[in-house]
């Protein structure tokens, strides 16, 4: 289970019920497709497993994608490090950095690898460029590409057309699913299945979140979104995640919130600014600013109740060093640090909430990611913006094309 505890004054239900109705209308309209992936993506599991079942030679899955085509998968790879049931390793190329490109290629062999080229539009310049570099690096002929590459894209996109031309297997992203909301589509399901993760449990966790919100009417997401969107002087939300397993999730959270909620509304610029930290490490860097700096931040703590294989700190006594943590489970120490920091911030009258996962597995990862997608959609409704476009990003893309053309 996932528990979300709010340490701030909550609103009367009649104040926020209209926003719940608008989210319901959004679901019923069918215009925003991510809501329905919990059901429609089930068929992808069988299709993915059938495709990969005879490819025993594949030891590496190399995903090439940007933004929404990679952040979510990176989050799942980090969170599900204990869940993998086979030996396929997942590599991710998500930047036009020669350093990371060359470093990744040093670790893989062509004959042991399957490359997933992911671009919703089918024309992402970074993805197309990396695709070409892979062809050149491995000295592949065009007729060989179908053995080593799989495309994930929109139906009838340029990438799909090229896949048809080259005989490359294509998986499709629904047209009404935006990139940063696509983790439960082929973008996430296909690589998870290829690597041996439990994609069905991921969808089941997401569906449980859907039912808690829409059927059981749990209101934590509504309360949290309303509080954070109406506190105009505290428009920075800090996600303080207490486990290194949340490193990729933090990146996904930043992209989801920033690209969805940072918008122009007429002459006004509005939105929540996301900051993501890892505890307990960042207690020794950013915490001072939160505690004593401007009160322009809200803080969400993310923790795991039970962690597997956590060692116990030995009962070793020194003459000068303290023994406070002796015989304490290392994960219990981490959670104690989380709780201590949280209550210190509450004492400073900051708006704080905590999300606690029972454990870290595919089901809980699915619930958590769907929770944040619903939270983002709810904030968008409350802010009166289009949550699902990114006009500011498109401007830079046009300038880049002009630079390259010149």
Swiss-Prot record:
It comes from the Bacteria. InterPro entries: G6P_Isomerase, Phosphoglucose_isomerase_CS, SIS_dom_sf, SIS_PGI_1, SIS_PGI_2. GO terms for biological process: gluconeogenesis; glucose 6-phosphate metabolic process; glycolytic process. One of its GO terms (molecular function) is carbohydrate derivative binding. One of its GO terms (cellular component) is cytosol. CDD domains: SIS_PGI_1 (cd05015), SIS_PGI_2 (cd05016). Keywords: Cytoplasm, Gluconeogenesis, Glycolysis, Isomerase. It is an enzyme of class 5 (isomerase). It catalyses: alpha-D-glucose 6-phosphate = beta-D-fructose 6-phosphate. It is found in: Cytoplasm. Pathway: Carbohydrate biosynthesis; gluconeogenesis; Carbohydrate degradation; glycolysis; D-glyceraldehyde 3-phosphate and glycerone phosphate from D-glucose: step 2/4. Its main location: cytoplasm. The active site is at residues 259, 284, 397. Its EC number is 5.3.1.9. PROSITE patterns: P_GLUCOSE_ISOMERASE_1, P_GLUCOSE_ISOMERASE_2, P_GLUCOSE_ISOMERASE_3. HAMAP family: G6P_isomerase (MF_00473). Belongs to the GPI family. Catalyzes the reversible isomerization of glucose-6-phosphate to fructose-6-phosphate. This is Glucose-6-phosphate isomerase.
